[in-house]
Amino acid sequence: MPADERYYANMPASVFARPSFWSEIYWPLIHGDHARATAAMTKFARLPDALAGRTIDLIHCNHFFCIPAARNLSATAPLVIETQDVQALQYDLRNEGIFVIPPRATYDELLETELEFLRMADLLVHLNAEEWDTFEKLLPEMRNALVYPAVEEAPTGPGGETIVIVASGNFPNTLSVEWFLEHVAPQAPHAQVKIAGNVDGALKARNPALYERWKHLFLGRVDDIGAIYANAGLVLLPTTEGHGLSIKAVEALSSGAPLIATPQAFRGMKIDPRALANVTLCENAEGFATALEAAAIAGPATNTMASGAARETSDTRKFYLANFSHDAYAEKIRDIVLPLVTR
């Protein structure tokens, strides 16, 4: 994140000698109460001396558990919090995969702690439409705003013949690529798809036999992912898993390239993807394979929407610029935050 100044804070070693460390951090942590533990960690953080004499006009936190540190910085400055999904869901999932000493913190307990802290804010900013809708219901008394995050744009050309999937190795991406290789790729034999990103290692670990069958499609980690988008004639978004906004989907939108995608790729966005002229929406593997095979036989470069000039003015590019560009983010944040600092 760009910043004019950066300061770092952490808990001093002396905190371990305090009884409050054991009661507010250690005890909740061993029972899986990450919500209370992480909030206590920021409460005990030692703030830099250089900030002591500064006047704080506004505090923008990117997680609810930063609120104690924010209030140590200023007890009165307007406080804006980005919710970053329902953290209680993430904590509950984390507890599924680790050893937790009973009694384990329940989802309801984790959520109540999260909401307790969020009620301290003056404004809640939600980064996707699903999240915004959720918190409108959970905290209807709060001021809730939908502001999509700024996502770095991908190049819009010159385009080419390549059909690509871009995917990192997180679990939802791995499952989505697995679905594509099991159910779509065998039905589209003319499509020579290139899969860029470190999803190759994740799939190899999860499904070695499937990876071996299709390993010729994988490029692995690519230093210049922009070049992948720039030279693509068609981008695939075979998304079947995940929640919250898909950053890879936003990157693909910004490239302006023709897309074949599942509805799940557009999760968290207030848009009907069927209204985007350069998007072919497919709700099942058969439809995805049919669209992909037809595009491969025709040749991606023959699509009039695949050239650099067409990509610059495509529907997905316009949607990106209006919602996910740095200018769009700055404008929306300014409009909702300005009343807090001028009241």
Model-derived features with residue positions:
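Short hydrophobic beta-strand element within catalytic cores of glycosyltransferases
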Residues: K248-A252, P258-A265
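Donor nucleotide-sugar binding/catalytic pocket of nucleotide-sugar-dependent glycosyltransferases
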Residues: R104-Y107, L115-A154
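Short N-terminal targeting/anchoring amphipathic segment
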Residues: P48-C66, P78-V80
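Acceptor-binding helix/loop patch of EC 2.4 sugar-transfer enzymes
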Residues: N10-A37, A77-E112, R274
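Acidic donor-binding loop of glycosyltransferase active sites
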Residues: D122, A230-G244, S255-A257
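Conserved catalytic-core segment of nucleotide-activated headgroup transferases in glycan assembly
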Residues: L111, A145-A230, C282
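Conserved acidic donor-binding segment of nucleotide-sugar-dependent glycosyltransferases
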Residues: A277-E286, E293-N303
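A charged, aromatic-enriched C-terminal amphipathic alpha-helix characteristic of glycosyltransferases
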Residues: P155, N303-L338
